[in-house]
Amino acid sequence: MSCSKSMVLGYWDIRGLAHAIRMLLEFTDTSYEEKQYTCGEAPDYDRSQWLDVKFKLDLDFPNLPYLMDGKNKITQSNAILRYIARKHNMCGDTEEEKIRVDIMENQIMDFRMQLVRLCYNSNHESLKPQYLEQLPAQLKQFSLFLGKFTWFAGEKLTFVDFLTYDVLDQNRMFEPKCLDEFPNLKAFMCRFEALEKIAAFLQSDRCFKMPINNKMAKWGNKSIC
């Protein structure tokens, strides 16, 4: 790794909002270490590992994930991604690329949160059919936006590809056939997974494929599907 002083990424010991960040750190050869917090078991789901230090880290808006890079202390997962991406010119070059990045950053997070809300809802099983019914229409929008481009900003890889891969992969795990109607999305997933540093990370013990969510979730809360 290239940097002499490691960044510190703080998050729960799950995939969650940190997967795209971890992949971007790995892809950019950024030296980093993780501070992982563990949520307790049912029924209390004790979060004291994090809550005991939450307001002692000099964070402006204390939350997980956080990234510490020397004097720079950042929360909000997309702000962290942008911070890393700016260091490596991965936010888009042209105005068109930057616009597409801005759109995708927000659109994919809206999409992510729909699945998150479902997974943590106590009525998960009864609400699941409704989610699956509307899923193809949402995926079609992403397919049309990608079109014939290689990446979601165009022909240049940007940080939103890391976000989008993560969210599409979670949906693919939730409904394995959901991408079958969208060859360009499937091709995007294959291209991303074939990036040398991404392929190595996904096969490493540093990668959290599961659990996606924390222990109180109704889906994605265990180490295997």
Curated annotation (Swiss-Prot):
Pfam families: GST_C (PF00043), GST_N (PF02798). Substrate binds at residue 120. Its EC number is 2.5.1.18. The modification Phosphoserine is found at residue 6. It catalyses: RX + glutathione = an S-substituted glutathione + a halide anion + H(+). It is an enzyme of class 2 (transferase). The N-terminus is blocked. Residues 5-92 form the GST N-terminal domain. Coiled coil: none annotated. Transmembrane segments: none annotated. GO terms for cellular component: cytoplasm; cytosol; sperm fibrous sheath. One of its GO terms (biological process) is glutathione metabolic process. GO terms for molecular function: enzyme binding; glutathione binding; glutathione transferase activity; identical protein binding; protein homodimerization activity. Expressed in testis and brain. Very low expression in liver, kidney, heart and lung. Glutathione binds at residues 11-12, 50-54, 63-64, 76-77. It comes from the Eukaryota. Conjugation of reduced glutathione to a wide number of exogenous and endogenous hydrophobic electrophiles. Homodimer. This is Glutathione S-transferase Mu 5. It comes from Rattus norvegicus (Rat).
